[in-house]
Amino acid sequence: MIDLKLLMNDFEEVAERLAKRHLEADFLEQARLLAGQYKAKKRESEELQAEQNAKSKLFGQYKKEGKEIDSLKAELDTLKIRLSEILPEVSVLERELESLALIIPNLPDEKTPIGRDEHDNIEIRRVLEPKMFDFRPKEHWELAEQNGWIEFDRGVKLAKSRFSVLRKEGARMSRALISYMLDFNHSRGFEEVVTPVIVNRETLLGTGQLPKFENDLFKISEVIEEEQGGEKGRGHELYLIPTAEVTLTNLYRDEIIPHDELPLLLTAHTPCFRKEAGSAGRDTRGIIRQHQFDKVELVALTKPEESDAIQQKMIDCASDLLSSLGLPHRLVQLCGGDLGFGASNTVDIEVWLPGQNCYREISSISNTRDFQARRAMIRYKDEDKKNRLVHTLNGSSLAVGRTLVAIMENYQNADGTIEIPEVLRRYL
């Protein structure tokens, strides 16, 4: 959540930074008007309360000195009535402003270039040269069917479209990749964590998936049958996680972390679940875009002054992991129009897929600054014993299915067989 004080006191700066995202002008105008109304009502209520306090003090003094108090009492009664009217108005406006703030995206920082969509992203550098094949490289779904690694029809039979079944070396390779990724991340200083994959609503509010992206989530409605506190049959909203970013970040929700425990560097493997509501017609073949997929995530909680350096550490970790697998890739700085909701800046890592003859995203490393920490109330106690918001960062290291795709396409032979990267062989 953006800083409401900044929204109210320096709206022009907020609007200028959000302009990088090409938000609709009507939405920003609504935010400006609501912030103005709240600020005016809040100021009026504070002035009335100050006047009430002053006159209450005077009332006590007059009464003690035996002075006439009837007119002063009448003024206090009027102030009391006015405050009883305005304070609920302030509360309503505050709730409306907080609700609006929950759907306002993060402010892009100075690293984020101006641009409307992915075509305006800026390539930073390329790592490893793509292999030149002396035959037409096949796409991963062709190789999967030929080798019996992935069964698409059976995935649909078991669930629906965008589900699949890994078999034989495909299943073993996926398991090997998960173990290798976790070991690699651990070697770079990230603590391995195992978290739930089902979470409550508050957890998703903390990292920003709710309320704006509820349609992208798989929701579970649990009814508690046993009587709890005299309430029977109470419903409880639960969701399947779209990424381990959600659970790793919210581990510290509503907590104050000692400054000497920062930075916290965490990694976890989880299955992830997404409805992909806005992806109809995109990547309908293969396993690039699935409703259920495995991912190994990196999350960091840091002091504000350390977050840029930690973001670079995370970028290097994911890039070096790809390099260790011999997979060509490039780093791309996302423009404002392509930036995720919670990110202040993002570097995408895109892996080369020779079968598709293009680079495809395999990791996004984002610095959210204090956006998520403010929503989730994750703070740390600094050296002066003051509570401050941490910065949170997240990124994949890596998306397992897409890494499997990249290995299949980059390590294929002319006869359709697939070599195994050397670093994975001890895991198989």
From Swiss-Prot:
L-serine binds at residues 243-245, 297, 396. One of its GO terms (molecular function) is ATP binding. Its EC number is 6.1.1.11. CDD domains: SerRS_core. This is Serine--tRNA ligase. Catalyzes the attachment of serine to tRNA(Ser). Is also able to aminoacylate tRNA(Sec) with serine, to form the misacylated tRNA L-seryl-tRNA(Sec), which will be further converted into selenocysteinyl-tRNA(Sec). Homodimer. The tRNA molecule binds across the dimer. Gene3D superfamilies: Bira Bifunctional Protein, Domain 2 (3.30.930.10), Serine-tRNA synthetase, tRNA binding domain (1.10.287.40). It catalyses: tRNA(Ser) + L-serine + ATP = L-seryl-tRNA(Ser) + AMP + diphosphate + H(+); tRNA(Sec) + L-serine + ATP = L-seryl-tRNA(Sec) + AMP + diphosphate + H(+). It comes from the Bacteria. Keywords: Aminoacyl-tRNA synthetase, ATP-binding, Cytoplasm, Ligase, Nucleotide-binding, Protein biosynthesis. GO terms for cellular component: cytoplasm. Belongs to the class-II aminoacyl-tRNA synthetase family. Type-1 seryl-tRNA synthetase subfamily. Pfam families: Seryl_tRNA_N, tRNA-synt_2b. It is found in: Cytoplasm. ATP binds at residues 274-276, 361-364. One of its GO terms (biological process) is seryl-tRNA aminoacylation. HAMAP family: Ser_tRNA_synth_type1 (MF_00176). Consists of two distinct domains, a catalytic core and a N-terminal extension that is involved in tRNA binding.
